[in-house]
Amino acid sequence: MVYPYRVLCYSKTNILSFSASYQLPEAAIHTFCEQCQKSEYVQVKCVLTSTSLEKMVPLNLLSSDRTMLIGMYIQSLEIRDCGAPAANDIGKIQKIDDYGQFHTLWKAGKNFTVLPGIDSFVIIHNNFG
């Protein structure tokens, strides 16, 4: 089976995304998830997100996972949307909805939702001290 998805792997301190605009073989997804689990990531979850909003699937984040990510600071790399924060802008995750979208308050005071697996960003600081 092939998936036209991006793979998102996250832990307490980082989000790692393996993206492909083409269809991704199931074996490649499993290999990436195995690499995540062997790396420094402690609490790794591998999920699939679609590359198009019409096919976007919920991330199925557990309540504890959402709590873990709320309050983390992210830096935008590339967000493809009108009115999106500029590259390298910094924002704080305020909440995560049922579709796994990160509702973020950006440094300029603007609220903007980030879509993991579609938008590119990195976590630069977390709320664990």
In which residue ranges do the predicted regions lie?
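Short, flexible N-terminal segments of the mature chain
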Residues: 17-37, 90-95
